[in-house]
Amino acid sequence: TEHEKPGVREAGLFYLIMTHVGTAFIILTLLIFSQETGSFSFEAFRHPDQQLPEGLRSIAFFTALIGFGAKAGIVPLHVWLPYAHPAAPSHISALMSGVMIKTAIYGLIRVYFDFMGGVFPWWWGFTLLVAGTVSALLGVMYALMEHDLKGLLAFHSVENIGIILLGIGAGMIFHTYGLHELAALGLLAGLYHTINHAAFKALLFLGAGALQFSTHTRHIEEYGGLLRRMPWTGAFFLIGAVSIAALPPTNGFVSEWLVFQSLFLSFQLPTLFLKLMLPIAAAMLALTGALALACFAKAFGMSFLAQPRSAHARHATEVPWSMRVGMGFLAGLCIVLGLAPMLVVPLLDRVTAPLTGAAISSQVLALDGWVVAPVTVEFSSISTPVLAMLLVGAGALGLLIARLCGKGLRARYYKTWGCGLNLTPRMEYTATGFAQPIKQVFETIYQPTVKL
């Protein structure tokens, strides 16, 4: 059984240690509040007459960041994620990544915006901004080098937690300087991405579980040609891959676009340092997005396209309908959350408005929700329903032109010339080869792993 495997036991012990470290710092944070208020009641924590002294507030900031950061997987406290996710059953991995690590985001917001009364220095938000940037960039860079599919998805959880922190950090900075509408925008963007990540990451982990169920392996190098054998799983996995790569019109695009806009609005800040730092964070987020797209081009292409590279892949069959239903529901949710932000933004606005003092739902949504804008449409705006219609229209037009131009022509099929040799799966481009150019570009970051 699974619990008898040394790797599973090691992962379980590592996760146990890390989660207890996180819990210890969370308890320490609550004890700091309790010591000053004389109560463990959340209502007492937020009482205006019992605010913490400045020194204790900063200590509570760091203890909360370490405690909830260990739960969320913020770099450098992320080390348990690549161990725990591959070892856990896929449906548990979906639950851990989709729900469990998101409770840490709730905890951070609850402490900083609620218990602290939303009163904090600018460097608190900047600390979250730096932590988010580092987590997003390093998470996706290590995901590119990972060929265990569930390990790859685990590193992408680190990346997306970083993206969420970018929105929250920007919101905290704006809130410090009294820019309440922009603070609400950053916080709303972070929460929107929290929901979206729960949807597409759960979908991808269920997809990885379906592949493991049919092929008995998690290694991408042993996949290939699975789209013909597992068309439903392939279609659902593709939707998840497009969503996590933040391509329109899926949900990941909307929330990541809002995070970008909150960072670009830094020109309204009064200090030159922050005016420069937030766009730099946006540039790092853009690099993260490009690397995420490359990573899932690798993950999907090497898994589902070309020829099978192992006997397991050659004999793979589609998973039962009971496994497809969950993936289908989450795939539909990824599309709905992308096409219908008017269903999500008002709900999130009810959360962010009391915390930031600004209700922005009517400003973010224009034309009855068909257009999403960062507080004002004069700055920028986007419409995912219109983008979806344009994409469908462009595809239909391309097919029509191809049919008209090819009318009367007979299709001819030939084998690709292989220099006189029969092509075999060993000649295919591998996941390792796909990631090699990026590894060489960032070779100073990639270092050998030493297990003690």
Each model region followed by its residue ranges:
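Hydrophobic transmembrane alpha-helices and their helix-loop junctions in integral membrane proteins
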Residues: T1-V319
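Alpha-helical transmembrane segments and their membrane-interface junctions
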Residues: S243-L258, L333-V351, P448
